[in-house]
Protein backbone atom coordinates (compact mmCIF):
# COMPACT_ATOMS: atom_id res chain seq x y z
CA UNK A 1 0.00 0.00 0.00
CA UNK A 2 1.07 3.59 -0.29
CA UNK A 3 4.18 4.31 1.81
CA UNK A 4 3.82 0.85 3.31
CA UNK A 5 6.45 0.35 6.01
CA UNK A 6 7.29 -2.39 8.49
CA UNK A 7 9.92 -2.60 11.17
CA UNK A 8 11.71 -5.61 9.77
CA UNK A 9 13.51 -5.13 6.48
CA UNK A 10 13.27 -8.84 5.82
CA UNK A 11 9.55 -8.92 6.43
CA UNK A 12 9.25 -5.87 4.20
CA UNK A 13 10.86 -7.86 1.40
CA UNK A 14 8.40 -10.67 2.07
CA UNK A 15 5.51 -8.21 1.74
CA UNK A 16 6.99 -6.49 -1.30
CA UNK A 17 5.56 -8.97 -3.76
CA UNK A 18 2.10 -8.07 -2.47
CA UNK A 19 2.51 -4.33 -1.97
CA UNK A 20 4.54 -3.51 -5.06
CA UNK A 21 2.26 -1.40 -7.22
CA UNK A 22 3.44 1.89 -8.66
CA UNK A 23 1.66 5.17 -9.03
CA UNK A 24 -0.92 5.29 -11.80
CA UNK A 25 -3.87 7.43 -12.84
CA UNK A 26 -7.54 6.61 -13.20
CA UNK A 27 -9.99 8.86 -15.05
CA UNK A 28 -13.69 8.01 -15.03
CA UNK A 29 -16.32 9.92 -17.00
CA UNK A 30 -20.09 9.45 -17.21
CA UNK A 31 -22.37 11.24 -19.67
CA UNK A 32 -25.93 11.13 -18.34
CA UNK A 33 -28.90 11.18 -20.75
CA UNK A 34 -32.41 12.45 -19.94
CA UNK A 35 -33.82 8.93 -20.16
CA UNK A 36 -31.29 7.64 -17.61
CA UNK A 37 -29.02 5.90 -20.09
CA UNK A 38 -25.30 6.33 -19.47
CA UNK A 39 -22.14 6.57 -21.57
CA UNK A 40 -19.20 5.56 -19.39
CA UNK A 41 -15.50 5.90 -20.09
CA UNK A 42 -12.73 4.61 -17.83
CA UNK A 43 -9.14 5.51 -18.70
CA UNK A 44 -6.11 3.92 -17.03
CA UNK A 45 -2.67 5.52 -17.27
CA UNK A 46 -0.03 3.06 -16.10
CA UNK A 47 3.44 1.63 -16.55
CA UNK A 48 2.04 -1.88 -16.86
CA UNK A 49 1.02 -3.61 -20.07
CA UNK A 50 -1.88 -6.02 -20.69
CA UNK A 51 -4.32 -3.90 -18.67
CA UNK A 52 -6.89 -4.23 -21.46
CA UNK A 53 -7.58 -7.79 -20.26
CA UNK A 54 -6.32 -7.72 -16.66
CA UNK A 55 -7.37 -4.71 -14.61
CA UNK A 56 -8.93 -3.99 -11.24
CA UNK A 57 -12.25 -2.90 -12.75
CA UNK A 58 -12.75 -6.35 -14.25
CA UNK A 59 -13.67 -4.85 -17.63
CA UNK A 60 -12.58 -5.50 -21.19
CA UNK A 61 -13.68 -6.41 -24.69
CA UNK A 62 -15.17 -9.69 -23.46
CA UNK A 63 -17.58 -7.69 -21.31
CA UNK A 64 -18.66 -5.56 -24.27
CA UNK A 65 -16.41 -2.56 -23.67
CA UNK A 66 -14.81 -0.73 -26.56
CA UNK A 67 -11.10 -0.80 -25.77
CA UNK A 68 -8.31 1.34 -27.17
CA UNK A 69 -4.64 1.12 -26.20
CA UNK A 70 -1.91 3.70 -26.69
CA UNK A 71 1.62 2.89 -25.61
CA UNK A 72 3.12 6.27 -26.51
CA UNK A 73 4.35 8.57 -23.75
CA UNK A 74 2.54 11.53 -25.30
CA UNK A 75 -0.81 9.90 -24.62
CA UNK A 76 0.05 9.37 -20.98
CA UNK A 77 1.19 12.96 -20.52
CA UNK A 78 -2.15 14.57 -21.28
CA UNK A 79 -3.50 17.46 -19.24
CA UNK A 80 -2.82 16.55 -15.62
CA UNK A 81 -0.83 17.82 -12.68
CA UNK A 82 2.74 18.60 -13.68
CA UNK A 83 4.88 15.92 -12.10
CA UNK A 84 7.86 13.75 -12.89
CA UNK A 85 5.69 10.63 -12.93
CA UNK A 86 3.88 11.76 -16.07
CA UNK A 87 6.80 10.72 -18.27
CA UNK A 88 6.83 7.30 -16.64
CA UNK A 89 3.22 6.38 -17.45
CA UNK A 90 3.74 4.76 -20.84
CA UNK A 91 0.43 2.97 -21.40
CA UNK A 92 -3.05 4.42 -21.79
CA UNK A 93 -6.04 2.08 -21.76
CA UNK A 94 -9.43 3.56 -22.59
CA UNK A 95 -12.64 1.59 -21.97
CA UNK A 96 -16.02 2.89 -23.22
CA UNK A 97 -19.49 1.41 -22.96
CA UNK A 98 -23.12 2.57 -23.06
CA UNK A 99 -25.66 1.35 -20.51
CA UNK A 100 -29.44 1.53 -20.71
CA UNK A 101 -29.68 2.46 -17.04
CA UNK A 102 -27.73 2.86 -13.82
CA UNK A 103 -28.98 -0.54 -12.68
CA UNK A 104 -27.49 -2.23 -15.74
CA UNK A 105 -24.20 -0.44 -15.08
CA UNK A 106 -24.25 -1.57 -11.45
CA UNK A 107 -24.72 -5.19 -12.49
CA UNK A 108 -21.29 -4.97 -14.07
CA UNK A 109 -19.33 -2.41 -12.05
CA UNK A 110 -20.74 -2.80 -8.54
CA UNK A 111 -20.66 -6.56 -8.12
CA UNK A 112 -19.37 -7.45 -4.61
CA UNK A 113 -15.71 -8.43 -4.81
CA UNK A 114 -12.69 -8.22 -2.48
CA UNK A 115 -10.26 -7.79 -5.37
CA UNK A 116 -12.01 -5.37 -7.75
CA UNK A 117 -12.78 -1.64 -7.76
CA UNK A 118 -16.51 -1.18 -7.18
CA UNK A 119 -18.51 1.73 -8.60
CA UNK A 120 -22.25 2.17 -8.00
CA UNK A 121 -24.33 4.60 -10.08
CA UNK A 122 -27.71 6.15 -9.26
CA UNK A 123 -30.10 8.14 -11.46
CA UNK A 124 -33.34 9.84 -10.41
CA UNK A 125 -35.74 11.82 -12.57
CA UNK A 126 -38.58 13.72 -10.87
CA UNK A 127 -41.39 15.65 -12.54
CA UNK A 128 -42.22 18.93 -10.74
CA UNK A 129 -44.79 20.39 -13.19
CA UNK A 130 -42.81 23.45 -14.21
CA UNK A 131 -39.46 21.65 -13.96
CA UNK A 132 -38.04 18.17 -14.19
CA UNK A 133 -35.10 17.50 -11.88
CA UNK A 134 -32.27 15.11 -12.70
CA UNK A 135 -30.07 13.62 -10.00
CA UNK A 136 -27.05 11.46 -10.75
CA UNK A 137 -24.34 10.04 -8.53
CA UNK A 138 -21.38 7.68 -8.70
CA UNK A 139 -20.13 6.02 -5.53
CA UNK A 140 -16.65 4.58 -5.06
CA UNK A 141 -16.88 1.77 -2.53
CA UNK A 142 -14.29 1.65 0.24
CA UNK A 143 -11.02 0.16 -0.97
CA UNK A 144 -10.07 -1.18 2.46
CA UNK A 145 -10.79 -4.90 2.31
CA UNK A 146 -9.03 -5.88 5.52
CA UNK A 147 -11.26 -7.63 8.05
CA UNK A 148 -9.71 -5.71 10.95
CA UNK A 149 -11.72 -2.57 11.74
CA UNK A 150 -9.88 0.73 11.38
CA UNK A 151 -11.98 2.36 14.12
CA UNK A 152 -9.49 1.33 16.81
CA UNK A 153 -6.70 3.11 14.94
CA UNK A 154 -8.44 6.20 13.54
CA UNK A 155 -10.56 8.71 15.46
CA UNK A 156 -13.61 10.71 14.48
CA UNK A 157 -11.28 13.70 14.10
CA UNK A 158 -9.23 11.72 11.57
CA UNK A 159 -12.31 10.93 9.50
CA UNK A 160 -13.46 14.56 9.64
CA UNK A 161 -10.00 15.63 8.45
CA UNK A 162 -10.23 13.19 5.53
CA UNK A 163 -13.72 14.46 4.65
CA UNK A 164 -12.39 18.03 4.52
CA UNK A 165 -9.35 17.31 2.36
CA UNK A 166 -9.32 19.46 -0.80
CA UNK A 167 -8.96 18.14 -4.34
CA UNK A 168 -5.72 16.35 -5.12
CA UNK A 169 -3.01 18.88 -5.94
CA UNK A 170 -4.64 21.74 -4.05
CA UNK A 171 -2.44 23.36 -1.37
CA UNK A 172 -3.03 22.64 2.31
CA UNK A 173 -1.64 24.41 5.37
CA UNK A 174 1.58 23.31 7.03
CA UNK A 175 -0.40 22.20 10.07
CA UNK A 176 -2.67 20.07 7.89
CA UNK A 177 0.36 18.66 6.09
CA UNK A 178 1.89 17.56 9.41
CA UNK A 179 -1.43 16.06 10.48
CA UNK A 180 -1.68 14.19 7.17
CA UNK A 181 1.82 12.76 7.58
CA UNK A 182 0.97 11.49 11.06
CA UNK A 183 -2.31 10.10 9.76
CA UNK A 184 -0.54 8.16 7.00
CA UNK A 185 1.92 6.88 9.57
CA UNK A 186 -0.88 5.48 11.72
CA UNK A 187 -2.65 4.02 8.72
CA UNK A 188 0.34 2.24 7.19
CA UNK A 189 2.79 1.70 10.07
CA UNK A 190 0.20 0.62 12.60
CA UNK A 191 -3.20 -0.29 11.16
CA UNK A 192 -2.02 -1.85 7.88
CA UNK A 193 0.77 -3.80 9.60
CA UNK A 194 -1.62 -5.27 12.13
CA UNK A 195 -4.42 -5.89 9.63
CA UNK A 196 -2.03 -7.59 7.22
CA UNK A 197 -0.69 -9.79 10.01
CA UNK A 198 -4.20 -10.73 11.18
CA UNK A 199 -5.21 -11.81 7.68
CA UNK A 200 -2.27 -14.23 7.48
CA UNK A 201 -2.65 -15.35 11.06
CA UNK A 202 -6.30 -16.24 10.52
CA UNK A 203 -5.32 -18.05 7.33
CA UNK A 204 -3.03 -20.28 9.42
CA UNK A 205 -5.67 -20.70 12.13
CA UNK A 206 -8.02 -22.02 9.45
CA UNK A 207 -5.52 -24.75 8.53
CA UNK A 208 -4.49 -25.70 12.09
CA UNK A 209 -5.77 -28.59 14.16
CA UNK A 210 -6.86 -28.03 17.76
CA UNK A 211 -3.37 -28.39 19.27
CA UNK A 212 -1.75 -26.19 16.61
CA UNK A 213 -4.45 -23.57 17.00
CA UNK A 214 -3.85 -23.42 20.75
CA UNK A 215 -0.12 -22.85 20.20
CA UNK A 216 -0.73 -20.18 17.57
CA UNK A 217 -3.11 -18.26 19.81
CA UNK A 218 -0.72 -18.55 22.77
CA UNK A 219 2.16 -17.06 20.77
CA UNK A 220 0.15 -14.62 18.61
CA UNK A 221 1.59 -11.41 20.05
CA UNK A 222 5.16 -12.71 20.21
CA UNK A 223 4.89 -13.74 16.54
CA UNK A 224 3.66 -10.28 15.63
CA UNK A 225 6.52 -8.57 17.49
CA UNK A 226 9.08 -10.91 15.95
CA UNK A 227 7.85 -10.22 12.43
CA UNK A 228 8.10 -6.47 12.87
CA UNK A 229 11.19 -6.05 15.04
CA UNK A 230 14.06 -4.21 13.38
CA UNK A 231 16.76 -6.84 13.83
CA UNK A 232 14.73 -9.86 12.83
CA UNK A 233 16.82 -12.70 11.36
CA UNK A 234 13.90 -14.34 9.60
CA UNK A 235 13.98 -15.32 5.95
CA UNK A 236 12.17 -13.28 3.32
CA UNK A 237 9.27 -15.73 3.68
CA UNK A 238 9.16 -15.94 7.49
CA UNK A 239 6.23 -18.27 8.11
CA UNK A 240 7.89 -21.70 7.55
CA UNK A 241 10.79 -21.00 9.95
CA UNK A 242 8.49 -19.29 12.45
CA UNK A 243 6.09 -22.21 12.57
CA UNK A 244 8.97 -24.67 12.75
CA UNK A 245 10.55 -22.81 15.69
CA UNK A 246 7.25 -23.05 17.56
CA UNK A 247 6.83 -26.73 16.75
CA UNK A 248 3.70 -26.09 14.72
CA UNK A 249 3.59 -28.47 11.79
CA UNK A 250 1.27 -26.64 9.42
CA UNK A 251 2.20 -27.54 5.86
CA UNK A 252 2.63 -24.16 4.13
CA UNK A 253 3.48 -25.91 0.87
CA UNK A 254 0.09 -27.62 0.68
CA UNK A 255 -2.36 -26.89 -2.11
CA UNK A 256 -4.94 -25.63 0.40
CA UNK A 257 -2.47 -23.13 1.88
CA UNK A 258 -1.43 -21.90 -1.57
CA UNK A 259 -5.08 -21.49 -2.59
CA UNK A 260 -5.92 -19.45 0.50
CA UNK A 261 -2.74 -17.41 0.15
CA UNK A 262 -3.51 -16.62 -3.49
CA UNK A 263 -6.98 -15.40 -2.53
CA UNK A 264 -5.54 -13.20 0.23
CA UNK A 265 -2.84 -11.80 -2.05
CA UNK A 266 -5.38 -10.82 -4.71
CA UNK A 267 -7.14 -8.71 -2.08
CA UNK A 268 -3.89 -7.16 -0.83
CA UNK A 269 -2.72 -6.39 -4.37
CA UNK A 270 -5.98 -4.59 -5.13
CA UNK A 271 -5.66 -2.41 -2.01
CA UNK A 272 -2.07 -1.62 -2.91
CA UNK A 273 -3.05 -0.62 -6.45
CA UNK A 274 -6.03 1.47 -5.34
CA UNK A 275 -4.10 3.37 -2.67
CA UNK A 276 -1.36 4.31 -5.16
CA UNK A 277 -3.78 5.87 -7.64
CA UNK A 278 -4.40 9.47 -8.67
CA UNK A 279 -8.07 9.87 -9.51
CA UNK A 280 -10.15 12.17 -11.69
CA UNK A 281 -13.92 11.77 -11.92
CA UNK A 282 -16.26 13.56 -14.34
CA UNK A 283 -20.05 13.67 -14.59
CA UNK A 284 -21.78 15.38 -17.53
CA UNK A 285 -25.39 16.30 -16.72
CA UNK A 286 -27.34 18.85 -18.77
CA UNK A 287 -29.68 21.43 -17.26
CA UNK A 288 -29.66 24.31 -14.81
CA UNK A 289 -27.46 23.40 -11.84
CA UNK A 290 -29.32 22.86 -8.56
CA UNK A 291 -26.61 21.40 -6.32
CA UNK A 292 -23.45 19.30 -6.42
CA UNK A 293 -20.35 18.40 -4.40
CA UNK A 294 -17.84 18.75 -7.25
CA UNK A 295 -14.38 20.26 -6.84
CA UNK A 296 -14.96 22.36 -9.97
CA UNK A 297 -17.58 22.92 -12.67
CA UNK A 298 -17.32 23.96 -16.31
CA UNK A 299 -20.70 24.37 -18.00
CA UNK A 300 -22.50 21.14 -17.25
CA UNK A 301 -19.38 19.11 -16.58
CA UNK A 302 -18.64 18.37 -12.93
CA UNK A 303 -15.07 17.48 -11.92
CA UNK A 304 -13.52 15.79 -8.89
CA UNK A 305 -9.90 14.96 -8.05
CA UNK A 306 -10.24 13.09 -4.75
CA UNK A 307 -7.42 11.77 -2.63
CA UNK A 308 -7.64 7.99 -2.28
CA UNK A 309 -8.20 8.63 1.44
CA UNK A 310 -11.70 9.89 0.62
CA UNK A 311 -12.76 6.33 -0.16
CA UNK A 312 -10.11 4.36 1.72
CA UNK A 313 -12.30 3.38 4.66
CA UNK A 314 -15.83 4.34 3.63
CA UNK A 315 -17.83 4.83 0.47
CA UNK A 316 -17.51 8.21 -1.25
CA UNK A 317 -20.25 9.66 -3.46
CA UNK A 318 -19.91 12.18 -6.30
CA UNK A 319 -23.24 13.77 -7.16
CA UNK A 320 -24.85 16.47 -9.27
CA UNK A 321 -28.45 17.65 -9.63
CA UNK A 322 -29.89 19.82 -12.39
CA UNK A 323 -33.31 20.87 -13.62
CA UNK A 324 -34.92 21.64 -16.95
CA UNK A 325 -38.14 23.61 -17.58
CA UNK A 326 -41.15 21.66 -18.81
CA UNK A 327 -42.17 23.79 -21.80
CA UNK A 328 -45.50 21.99 -22.26
CA UNK A 329 -46.41 22.61 -18.61
CA UNK A 330 -45.52 26.29 -18.91
CA UNK A 331 -47.60 26.65 -22.10
CA UNK A 332 -50.54 24.79 -20.54
CA UNK A 333 -50.38 26.97 -17.43
CA UNK A 334 -50.28 30.17 -19.47
CA UNK A 335 -53.25 29.03 -21.56
CA UNK A 336 -55.21 28.23 -18.41
CA UNK A 337 -54.41 31.66 -16.94
CA UNK A 338 -55.44 33.37 -20.18
CA UNK A 339 -58.69 31.41 -20.23
CA UNK A 340 -59.43 32.36 -16.62
CA UNK A 341 -58.59 36.00 -17.32
CA UNK A 342 -60.82 36.01 -20.40
CA UNK A 343 -63.68 34.49 -18.41
CA UNK A 344 -63.35 37.06 -15.65
CA UNK A 345 -63.23 39.88 -18.16
CA UNK A 346 -66.44 38.67 -19.85
CA UNK A 347 -68.22 38.49 -16.50
CA UNK A 348 -67.15 42.04 -15.69
CA UNK A 349 -68.44 43.34 -19.03
CA UNK A 350 -71.81 41.75 -18.38
Question: Which residues make up each language-model segment?
Answer:
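C-terminal motif of bacterial Sec signal peptides marking the signal peptidase cleavage site
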Residues: 18-21
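Bacterial N-terminal signal peptides that target proteins for export
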Residues: 2-9
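Residues in flexible loops and secondary-structure boundaries
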Residues: 9, 38-40, 291, 312
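Start-of-domain marker
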Residues: 23-85
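Mature, soluble, non-transmembrane domains
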Residues: 72-337, 341-344
